[in-house]
Amino acid sequence: MAWNVHANLLSFGIDVTMITNGENIVKTRYVDEKSNQQILRVDIENDVKPFKGNMPEGDFDALVISDYDKGFITTQQLFELVEWFDGPIFIDSKKTTLPVDDAYIKINDYEYSRLEYKDHPNLIITRGSKGAEYKGKVYPGEKVNVYDVVGAGDTFLAALTYGYLTYGRIEEAIPLANKSAAVAVSHTGTYVLTGEDVNAIRS
């Protein structure tokens, strides 16, 4: 969720201005104690009202959009945001129609299978333990004991943004994002990177 992306961006020392929906979405996960495997997830959510405010003024280094397609950002608004912002844009969205140009799109295997247009020049596909694929090249994931994949995509998105802003190349940002996601899945529940984690990832 957007709050998890926000929290991980803060862990990397990035100043963040966040706009999100005011409605609470509660996710309850039922996990088997012995195997630590999720058995069931129950979501309780109210209708989410579309965003109708103004974008904040100021100079921003990047625009990060975490969109679970609950209704806060319409498809039209998503395209308008990409056209409006003059700088690097990073999108993680469950929509099936996404901007083709001027943004890095991070999606997983399932989301990729649902895309209406798959020939995207800046598509980054996360493939779980296998890592991430970009322009036909697979960037291998870290070998770790996986306890919980919840929130790993959020961690990846935040780290990808930080890596790009730091190194200036998405090819260098992806390995850092893989390392960050590996830390997240090594813990149970939605995990936010600590300062110690970030120092280890950057070393």
For each feature predicted by the language model, list its residue ranges.
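Conserved N-terminal subdomain of the carbohydrate kinase-like
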Residues: 1-65, 191-203
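A structural micro-motif
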Residues: 14, 37, 87-88, 103, ...
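Short, ordered loop/turn segments at secondary-structure junctions
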Residues: 21, 94-95, 110
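A generic structural signal for well-ordered coil/turn residues at beta-strand boundaries
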Residues: 24-25, 36-38, 101, 119, ...
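Structural motif
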Residues: 41, 62-66, 90, 106, ...
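Conserved phosphate-binding/catalytic region of the ribokinase-like
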Residues: 46, 59, 76-88, 93-99, ...
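Glycine-rich phosphate-binding loops at beta-strand->alpha-helix junctions
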Residues: 68-73
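A short beta-strand/loop micro-motif in the catalytic core of glycosyltransferases
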Residues: 103-109
